[in-house]
Amino acid sequence: MAPLFILTETAAGLVLFKADKKLLKKDDVASEIETAEGINGLLKLKQFQKFDSAATALEEVASLVEGKVSPMLASLLDTLKDEKKASLAVADPKLGQAINKLPGLTLTPISDSKTNDIFRGIRDHLPSLIPGLLPEHISTMSLGLSHSLSRHKLKFSPDKVDTMIVQAISLLDDLDKELNTYAMRVKEWYGWHFPEMGKIVNDNLAYARVILKVGMRVNTSSTDLADILPEEIETAIKAAAEVSMGTEITQEDLDNIKLLAEQVVGFTEYRQQLSSYLSARMQAIAPNLTELVGDLVGARLIAHAGSLMNLAKSPASTIQILGAEKALFRALKTKHDTPKYGLIYHASLVGQATGKNKGKIARMLAAKAAIGLRVDALSDWSAQGEGKGDDVDDEERSALGVTSRAKIERHLRGLEGKPLLPRGVAVGPNGKATSAPGKWEVKEARKYNADADGLAGDEPAAAVPIREKKNKKLIEEVAEESGSDSSDDSDASEKKPKKGDKEAKKAEKAAKKAEKAAKKAAKEAKKAAKAEKEAKKSDAPEVNGSKKRKSEDDGEKSEKKKKKKSKD
């Protein structure tokens, strides 16, 4: 009889069983394989090929789920080339079609309801069918493989977890508030004992370290602070300690102050470590956004939107005003102008712009950031996604952000009227090139102005130079000159180039004033003409009324004459 081979994939490896083909013709297959003894009597293990690692298991199972024949499965099926008229039971019909297309195999793939019953029995009694395989090992391997397969289907990557960004930036803000509170409390507390040190040492971390190393003020002169402070500041502190006006404190007070100083030092070091961690995570999750707006602003945008995907789905107009919702709704309610920027205002590119150009640069930056966000959120830079042997490097991932930032910088320099820099030159937050550090120079300090002091006794006041005021020409005189002959105009035009720029500007201003005066005079003349016309119109009805009265009187006289004639 022709044999029947059963292909089963497990979390441990690929298994090939051999059985009689009559097994498929039985009606009570499900009842026969319910027990381990029954299924062991029907099936015999032909070959078991283990997975070398979890990555190999994921790759093999993923290809089987997609209905593809992997190289490992092909090598397993090569052992069945010599079998004639044999059948192969598979769980997936799609996989059976792919196996049927393999060259050199004469196997007939089978996948129906009876084979499903057989596979169900194999899964239930797998430890008894494969010697040396414990149930605990199978459950552990199945759990790990299922998680890996789920991540593969979702294309999940631990480097893409933006929840870490949201938590890190929130914790960073909280740390800043706590550090400011603790540092202020340390300075106020230790200031009772050594108040002069607060004016000399401005850095909170250095202040706390000095407290931990010096302790009481009397120990300042004998303590070496070279590893904490520069030499000149150390000298100033030691000199101030000799003449300090602070009060004395007990050892218990100092112990509590030192405990608080240790908190300041610990929080400061942790904040630095958290800041570097946040920068690394932002570079891994959103490299293009980081290049455009920076790691802190980018992290705040992601935290405000909730996730990287939500931010990538937002249009550029939303990204531009993200963080200014109160101002936006207030403007919409009062029908005023809407805000031009929100959190993006703190980006270095917007800070380089001045005045009215801030809104333009914020709009351009938001548009480029929207494109970069979609690349960061939706692109698959892994080796598996790209089909390459190695992962894509950081420069290639952030190439879009670098080129977009360079375009915005060039556009900004054009708007500001600054000379365009050659490509590849870095620009600092102040808008200047940072390719080469400038030479440090000592500038002259502002000197004391003794003339600004008050005068005592009969001391003479300092002489103040008085500027001579030049007499401006009157408007009437300019008007007369403008109405002169053409010969005078030609003479003036010949003289203008010989005068300085200031005199030419004054002449232009005087001419403009004359034009304004002429326009005003013309307007007044028009008004006077209109007033005369209105007066004539008001006199016209009176003249017409007198004419009518005269005609009426003449008519009455003629009627009286006619009556007299009729009487006669």
From Swiss-Prot:
GO terms for cellular component: box C/D methylation guide snoRNP complex; nucleolus; small-subunit processome. It is found in: Nucleus, Nucleolus. Residues 477-491 have a biased composition (Acidic residues). Keywords: Nucleus, Ribonucleoprotein, Ribosome biogenesis, rRNA processing. Residues 492-540 have a biased composition (Basic and acidic residues). Residues 451-568 are annotated as: Disordered. The keyword Cytoplasm does not apply. GO terms for biological process: box C/D sno(s)RNA 3'-end processing; endonucleolytic cleavage in 5'-ETS of tricistronic rRNA transcript (SSU-rRNA, 5.8S rRNA, LSU-rRNA); endonucleolytic cleavage in ITS1 to separate SSU-rRNA from 5.8S rRNA and LSU-rRNA from tricistronic rRNA transcript (SSU-rRNA, 5.8S rRNA, LSU-rRNA); endonucleolytic cleavage to generate mature 5'-end of SSU-rRNA from (SSU-rRNA, 5.8S rRNA, LSU-rRNA); protein localization to nucleolus; snoRNA guided rRNA 2'-O-methylation. The keyword Nucleus applies. Transmembrane segments: none annotated. InterPro entries: Nop56/Nop58, NOP58/56_N, Nop_C, Nop_dom, Nop_dom_sf, NOSIC. It comes from the Eukaryota. Residues 285-417 form the Nop domain. One of its GO terms (molecular function) is snRNA binding. Belongs to the NOP5/NOP56 family. Required for pre-18S rRNA processing. May bind microtubules. This is Nucleolar protein 58.
